[in-house]
UniProtKB/Swiss-Prot annotation:
CDD domains: SIS_Etherase. The keyword Zinc-finger does not apply. This is N-acetylmuramic acid 6-phosphate etherase. A lyase-type mechanism (elimination/hydration) is suggested for the cleavage of the lactyl ether bond of MurNAc 6-phosphate, with the formation of an alpha,beta-unsaturated aldehyde intermediate with (E)-stereochemistry, followed by the syn addition of water to give product. One of its GO terms (molecular function) is carbon-oxygen lyase activity. It comes from Francisella tularensis subsp. holarctica (strain LVS). The keyword Methyltransferase does not apply.
Length: 294
């Protein structure tokens, strides 16, 4: 039985049949043109993406976590998105978690066969003490990865919300999830190499999930990352510039309040806008569910 026969990501792209005889310039043009399929795939899934973000936002507001889980490129993309959230939004590293078949070492070196064991998906979720408050997002371009299916089955069994993200229609993993996103950008230029368009598609979906979920819990004011964690000189300067941008104060004043606010951009802004001290600013934010109210 050919288990890959009807999977979109395994189909040949008629536009790249002569890839091996194209000039580099021709191949570059082709690969650029092929990326347009990514945007069309995302537009077609607008409603489903929206539903997923509403679900992830609900989970975060109610004490849950977002758990990405996948194998290979899909797993790496989940980790990549997850690890960027603490410095960008000052969330705990346990708020958005990325899990990959084969463990952390699989991020830099393929672990043969890890994705084929459904029980590994279950065990990885058990290792982080998954609860019913969490939302598990299974990612598999092919839509059939056993590791992901095992994870979704376990998540369902304990009452956690489940999501399946794939790049093929009628994906097998969709059957194991409450919500599904089947964004199909078309066959790859290099047949079956889902690190290409499928990977780009998945990354953009994860970008939307994490960013807009953070917006929903007050981590953003207007379009500014007011909960940025100042972990390097660039982010320290960005923090001060954000304070200037929102409040209209000069750089020196922004720097003074930044230090008074214990290097919290959000608290500094509230202190300036409300002409109050640090403790009062914290109380105002708590009363507003951690949102800056203009």
């Amino acid at each position: 039985m050919n288990i890959l026969e009807n999977i979109n990501t395994e189909k040949r792209n008629p536009r790249s049949l002569n890839l091996d005889s194209m000039s580099i310039a021709e191949a570059v043009s082709l690969m650029i043109d092929e990326e347009y399929g990514v945007i069309e795939a995302l537009k077609e899934q607008h409603r489903n993406i929206t539903e997923v973000i509403l679900a992830t936002s609900y989970s975060l507001r109610n004490g849950g976590r977002i758990i990405y889980i996948g194998a290979g490129t899909s797993g790496r993309l989940g980790i990549l998105d997850a690890v960027e959230c603490p410095p960008t939004f000052s969330v705990d590293y346990n708020t958005i978690v990325g899990l990959i078949a084969g463990g952390e070492k699989a991020f830099i070196q393929a672990q043969e066969g890890a994705e084929d064991a459904a029980n590994f998906g279950k065990e990885d979720l058990q290792s982080i003490n998954l609860t019913a408050k969490d939302i598990v997002i299974g990612i598999a371009a092919s839509g059939r990865t056993p590791y992901v299916i095992g994870a979704l089955e376990y998540a369902n069994s304990i009452g956690a919300t489940t999501v399946a993200i794939s790049c093929t229609k009628q994906a097998k993993i969709s059957k194991y999830a409450k919500y599904s996103i089947e964004a199909v950008p078309g066959p790859e230029v290099l047949t079956g190499s889902t690190r290409l368009k499928a990977g780009t598609t998945q990354k953009l979906i994860l970008n939307m999930i994490s960013t807009l979920s953070m917006v929903s819990v007050g981590k953003v004011y207007q379009n500014l990352m007011v909960d940025v964690k100042p972990t390097n000189q660039k982010l320290i300067e960005r923090s001060k510039n954000i304070i200037c941008e929102v409040t209209g104060v000069d750089y020196t004043t922004a720097e003074k309040f930044y230090l008074k606010a214990n290097k919290s951009v959000k608290v500094a802004i509230v202190m300036i806008l409300n002409n109050c001290d640090y403790e009062k600013a914290l109380a105002i934010l708590k009363n507003n569910n951690n949102f800056i109210k203009s």
